[in-house]
Regions:
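Cytoplasmic C-terminal tails of single-pass
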Residues: 1-14
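Membrane-proximal, non-transmembrane interaction modules
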Residues: 11-119
Length: 119
């Protein structure tokens, strides 16, 4: 399933991350890519080339809960800061971002599994 693949990718990413400075950027880029790939599969639409703003609009249109939407925005913006603004978070911050992504994927999976008549 898309969810299992995303969770496996997260686990693999965590196992291979030692916190070295040169690993930080690829780590955060991959976190965003995992979310994009998962959402692409669930939506059957390519989300890989969407900007963070476009991706957030897509999530907003889904009527996700405010907490989930806020968490997604926070994680994507932090990952963008690492990717584009040369922000180097502490290893603990990177691990926290990883945990947030894991929680986001769980929330999204519950959202996608809820019959639409209940939404």
């Amino acid at each position: 399933s898309a969810y299992r693949e995303a969770m496996d990718a997260l686990e693999e990413l965590s196992k291979n991350f030692s916190g070295n400075k040169e690993e930080v950027k690829p780590f955060h880029v991959t976190l965003s890519d995992i979310l994009r790939q998962y959402n692409s599969r669930m939506q059957q639409s390519n989300m890989m080339t969407k900007t963070t703003g476009e991706l957030l609009l897509c999530f907003k249109e889904k009527n996700l809960g405010a907490d989930t939407l806020s968490a997604i925005a926070e994680v994507l913006r932090k990952n963008d800061a690492v990717k584009f603004a040369k922000f180097i978070p502490l290893q603990t911050e990177s691990k926290n971002t990883w945990e947030q992504m894991k929680n986001i994927l769980s929330s999204l999976q519950q959202f996608y599994q809820t019959p639409k008549s209940q939404v």
